[in-house]
Amino acid sequence: MPIAYKNINQLWAYVFTETLKRLGLAYAVICPGSRSTPLAVAFAQQAPDIEGISILDERSAAFFALGLAKATNRPVAIVCTSGTAGANFYPAVIEAQESRVPLLLLTADRPPELRDCHSGQTIDQVKLFGSYPNWQTELALPVSDMGMLGYLRQTVIHSWYRMQAPTPGPVHLNIPFRDPLAPIPDGADLSYLLTKFHPEEFFAGITDTTSLPDHSQLSIPPEWLKSQRGIIIAGVAQPQQPQEYCRAIARLSQTLQWPVLAEGLSPIRNYADLNPYLISTYDLILRNQQLATRLAPDMVIQIGDMPTSKELRTWIDTHQPRRWVIDPSDQNLDPLHGRTTHLRIRVEELGCKGVEEDKSSVSEYLQLWCNAETKVRVNVDETLDKMEDLVECKAAWLLSQILPPETPLFIANSMPVRDVEFFWKPNNLRVRSHFNRGANGIDGTLSTALGIAHRHQSSVLITGDLALLHDTNGFLIRNKFVGHLTIILINNNGGGIFEMLPIAKFEPPFEEFFGTPQDIDFAQLCTTYNVQHELIHSWVHLQQRLNPLPNTGIRVLELRTNRKIDAQWRRDNLSNFAADNII
């Protein structure tokens, strides 16, 4: 249906959103405000091609958009008014940059004549997010000129490209508007401009040309083939095609006959049948110092970001092997500053052929790793299987075995990601793990999880109480949310991760400034937001609630644990799983 343009702001916003629609934008998160009126109206008129999602709190909205972009592997736009509204995007902008997620940040602004003169709700929004965007600019003010409409169209197209290449990340457009902001006449005559503006001709040829670089297959470096003591580290990763990613690593592993040390946040552990040399208990194995010395490699291939494990990092730093990092981004992924070469490709682009498994050809070094994995895995499984008390580390181990196939799972920062690394059991459930490990903060946990779950398969979030409390405004999204999210709340009334640090021995000030108990009744909190709540009393009870998952709504399954008991359990057990494993 043709739109009757009442003013230049309306036409400008139409060109802006129509260009995005033709590029393939599917979601726009809209925060309420006056200065952004032209954009909000234009996005609303693009329904159903672009779904406009209204979210009150800008910080929550930005993390919701981040989750949507993670789940879809596509850019998501987020709109706010002028003033401090955009500043609330900042934590999500940082995470988007650090975890390489495409976000289009649209901050409406007052015109130049209303800046630096104490006009209301006006701050300096140019380069508001510092160096974090892939690209940023301020658009020109809307004017009645065909050349400027072409400038607007091409700037949007360029923004779309810069969000996705060469490395995905956020782009910030600061967009000034003069009054009137609503679609009402402004006294200007647009008739002459509109006689020259023919949408089908103007927008012809707009397509999403962003694609992965067309690399030819890269042969395996000869020195890899010569090494008999090499390991592959499959780090933190959220690949668009997880099965192909896992197959590529399996081919490399079988070609080289090297073990794959797979982080719990890597899809490798959820496609375990693809890789016969998968090592999931490396953090526990390396706590045995004698065994760790025998396992020291002379070469390491790191795929993607480094795993969370401090034990692994310390071990590599101590032995200083020759290292290669495989990742298509332009980022430095070596926080250890070792003898490292970066290959700026995807692991799928390595030209290696898998070989049939031949047990007689397995090297002594590879066999040492596989034997250690088998023994430690048995110790872990037997210990956790017999555990009846609600000790939080068992949650990750149990989830790895009982979630419905291909469930999207968001893993909160702090202790949940560590328990996943320690205890996530290799499986073939194809669970789609998501996380915010760019900057590793707890902010935006609930909102990101809701973004991941929106219009997707029923999803699960595992989080501690502080991470959830830090983002309770995310519950305000409930009326806009389409889908289901189950929140597994590990409520230990405080910051359990700090119990593992040396400061835990100092009381005071530990409990007041690090433990930080909030003493929240989560049943009452959920009632406030009209969210379902259930207190879990046993592991069997939890298992009954997780398979199958509901189709709609948000619910909280609360497990009350004791963080001091949990911390003592880790101190007593983590180093013991491989204590007698001298092979």
Swiss-Prot record:
It catalyses: isochorismate + 2-oxoglutarate + H(+) = 5-enolpyruvoyl-6-hydroxy-2-succinyl-cyclohex-3-ene-1-carboxylate + CO2. Its EC number is 2.2.1.9. Signal peptide: none annotated. Keywords: Magnesium, Manganese, Metal-binding, Thiamine pyrophosphate, Transferase. It comes from the Bacteria. Catalyzes the thiamine diphosphate-dependent decarboxylation of 2-oxoglutarate and the subsequent addition of the resulting succinic semialdehyde-thiamine pyrophosphate anion to isochorismate to yield 2-succinyl-5-enolpyruvyl-6-hydroxy-3-cyclohexene-1-carboxylate (SEPHCHC). NCBIfam families: menD. This is 2-succinyl-5-enolpyruvyl-6-hydroxy-3-cyclohexene-1-carboxylate synthase. The lineage of its organism: Bacteria, Bacillati, Cyanobacteriota, Cyanophyceae, Nostocales. The gene is menD.
